[in-house]
A protein has these predicted regions:
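Aliphatic-rich helix starts adjacent to a transmembrane/signal segment
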Residues: 2-64
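Short linear sequence signals and composition-biased patches located at protein termini or domain-edge surfaces
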Residues: 7, 131-181
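Generic detector of short, locally flexible boundary/turn motifs and exposed helical patches
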Residues: 11, 21-25, 44-45, 114-116, ...
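Secondary-structure transition/capping residues
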Residues: 39-43, 70, 162
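Bulky hydrophobic/aromatic packing residues
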Residues: 40, 54, 80-81, 87, ...
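Conserved long hydrophobic alpha-helices within structured protein cores
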Residues: 57-65, 145-152
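Short, well-structured beta-strand/strand-turn elements
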Residues: 64-74
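Type IV pilin-like appendage domain
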Residues: 72-143, 168-170
């Protein structure tokens, strides 16, 4: 008697394999696209954080190490925060140890934080982010304490072409810098 040697798969085996493939491929694509969106969000957050950290560190360092006086005008006629009762909010002009005047402002669209002097403009944030609202103010706790400068701003991701949620990020920055006597 001859044995029947069948090669191939039964219809049930084929249906099971096609079913498994049909279920697993959409799941794999879903996981893949979720990972891509998470990676895009991570990149945007890194960009926002890098720009915000850079801006706040430069402003803190310049104010702490270079500033001798704070004025409400670029001509340095009105000094602010010179007594305990005085307080002022932007724009604030800073006179440094070399006699130069500089200030911080937001300019252009997107709003970039810039450090400006009479002859130089240096952007502290790039065009991939927007720093808005930006607030700078000074006050004194008492007459014999040095002025304190409060800096407050939000750094947002900026893209004129997309409104996708994973490409939006926002970090709030605030600090107080005490001037040296």
């Amino acid at each position: 008697m001859k044995k029947n040697k069948r090669t191939g798969f039964t219809i049930i085996e084929l249906i099971v394999v096609i079913g498994i493939i049909g279920i697993s491929i959409p799941a794999i694509f879903g996981i893949f696209f979720t990972m891509l969106r998470a990676q895009a969000k991570t990149y945007v957050l890194q960009e926002v954080k890098r720009n915000g950290d850079n801006a706040i560190n430069i402003m803190e360092t310049l104010i702490k190490q270079r500033v001798l006086g704070i004025y409400s005008d670029q001509a340095l006629t009105t000094e602010v925060c010179s007594t305990s009762s005085s307080q002022s909010s932007g724009p604030l002009y800073f006179k440094d140890r070399d006699g130069a005047v500089f200030y911080f402002a937001t300019e252009n669209s997107p709003f970039q934080i810039a450090s400006r002097t009479d002859s130089l403009e240096y952007y502290l944030t790039n065009q991939k982010v927007s720093a808005n609202p930006f607030s700078i103010q000074c006050f004194r706790k008492n007459t014999f304490s040095p002025p304190i400068v409060r800096i407050d701003f939000d750094v947002n991701s900026y893209s004129s072409t997309t409104t996708r949620q994973e490409e939006n990020a926002k970090i709030h920055y605030t600090t107080q810098v005490k001037l040296r006597n």
